[in-house]
Every structure is written in structure tokens, then in C-alpha cells.
Amino acid sequence: MLLRTLGLMIFLVFGLHVLHAQTKTTQTENIVLITFDGLRWQELFKGADSLMVDDTGLIEQPGSLLKDFWHPDPLERRKRLFPFFWSTMASQGQLYGNRAYGNHVNNQNKMWFSYPGYNEVLSGFADDTRINSNSKVNNPNVTFLEYLHKLPPYKGKVMAFGSWDVFPYIINRERSGIAVNAGFDLATGSDLTEVEKTVNRLQQEIRGPWGGVRLDPFTHHYALEAIKKHKPKILYIAYGETDDWAHDGKYDQYLWSAKQTDAYIREIWETLQSDPQYKGKTTMIITTDHGRGITKTSWKSHGSEIPQAGQIWMMAIGPDTPALGELKIQGQWQSAMLARTIFQLLGLDYPDAKAAPAVKEMKK
């Protein structure tokens, strides 16, 4: 009887995977999710802020940003700040959140700071009752990463890299078993590449200005090397510098970091397109955890006391995503919608009924 039961279970599991393979209509086999901590929609869609780009209280050297970032036309300014976003993403993908067109993207949560924002992106819903601080507490909610990691096709093929040392708790590394490299974690294992060894050494020698957040080059190069070495099917990369430079009131460093992150994302995308496992089979989604204020003072901060801090943005590119460019239609979206969207792009149903609906425009 036990053997018959086990045999039936194996048959059902195998049958479900065969059925999924036969009915799947999407081309997406891999997902890369990238978050860009605390980057405002204002810079994304309008470039450098005219109030701050040459303010001596927010930049180190007067006039130092004008050559690289300033132009009277905001469409030109945004290209200077984000050349990859406003070339490849704008021509082949989708960008949401330009409120000048009534195209609104908001947090579902009402906290408007990092842990609640990341929980929302990764689990598909806000949980303001339990996720209401940035404390290092394991997330009680199951993220889309963890759901995928439980499925045989993705087991051991889910990886996450983050600059902030709270990500092992947000993703609940302990419960999920997902490989998470965050904060000041080093690459580990007996088969480290020369790149990993070098990044390990440099991370220990170059600490950066913050206690709980490493500089983004380390996060980026660990993730880039993982693509080449481990070929994950599901990859999450969380860049963090922009938020910390903003908290420090350094608008010049905020802009330079934003531009560098655009270059990092270009490198990730071009690396994916050069690999047969990923080319034409990978969707990349980019968003942020929260917005910021709009004045010279409130720009440094976010949270429920800052009215604009729940205003965010998102973008996507991939084989199943229509190339709509910058969306200029009126509408309301939330970052909570991305978890179910990712599952639909993979041809799967999201298992948590609490999750927000998918972004229907992101899938053909």
C-alpha cells in the first residue's frame, strides 16, 4: 500500500510538470529582479533635480555636476543620468511611474521604508502589522523566491545578492535555504574563481562609509560572477548606495551612484544576452523599495511622515513583455503586483491568494 501511494505521488508530481511544460505559453525561463534602493521617480523620468544639482549644501564642489548631468530639457537630463534605461529599456521594454502622465506606481504598504518595501516586492503584499521596522527579524511571509526554490526546476537555482545586511532576514535564508550573499558576506566554497577571491579581498580592505551596507561594486561583481559560474534561473540583485548617499545629504554621490548602477544593470543585461541559457529566455524587472521627499530637506528622508515617499516606479524587459517604452497611460500600479507577475511570466500560478494581481501590461 505504501509503495502504491508513493508511486501515485511520484506520478502526480511528474504529471504536473509534464502538463506545465505542455501548456506553458511564455518564453521566459529565467527571472532577474533588481531593486534600486530609494531612487526617486523624479530622477528616473526628469534627470537631475534643478533645485539640488548645484546646491552647495548638497554637493561637494559647486558646478561639478553640470557638465555630466545638467541640461535644460529633462528628457536629455534623464538620458545623461540613465543612458541604459533611456536607450535599451525605453526601446525594448517598459517603464512605469511618470506621474506627469497620470502613470502612478505606489507602495501598497504605508510604512515607506526599506524592509516593508522589500517584503512587498518579494511576497506580493504589504504586511504593516508584522513588517513595521528595519530590524533583523526573519520574515514570516514566504517570498516568491522561496516558493520557486521549493519547485524541482528551480531548486538550488535561486540566488540573491544585496548590499544591505538585512536581506538574509527579509528573504529568510534560515527557513528558505536560498543562497543569499548580503551585507559584508564573502563568496564561499572550495572552487572560488579568481574574480571572487579578488572581490573577497577588496571587500575586506575597503569598508565604505556605512556600518550595515557595503558599497554596490561588491554586490554587483558577486552577482555578475554568479551568473557566469552558477547560472541561476532566478536571480535577485539589490543595490543600496543611492538611499544611503541620500540620507547623508550628498546629492552628488547620489547621482553618481545612480548612473553607475545604470551601467551595472547594462552589464548584467548584456551578459545575459551573450549566454544561450539566458538570451531570449530571460525577463528582467527593476523597481525600488520606496520613494523620497521633494524638498532639499525632505529629499534626504522617507517614511510615512513624508507624503511623496510612497511614490515609486518599475520597469521590465524580456521576451514576453511588449516593447511599450515609457507608459503614458493613466493608471495605478503597485510594487506588490510584481510577485504574481513573475509567476505568470514563468507560466505558473502564484500560490498565495493575498498577493496583489499581476501587471497585465507586462505580459503579452
Each language-model region and where it sits:
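Short, solvent-exposed loop/turn and secondary-structure capping segments
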Residues: 42-48, 100-101, 132-134, 161, ...
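Bacterial Sec-dependent N-terminal signal peptides
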Residues: 1-27
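Acidic, His- and aromatic-enriched active-site or binding-groove loops in soluble protein domains
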Residues: 123-137, 177-211
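Short, structured active-site-proximal loop/turn typified by the sulfatase FGly-forming signature C/S-X-P-X-R
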Residues: 42, 46-111
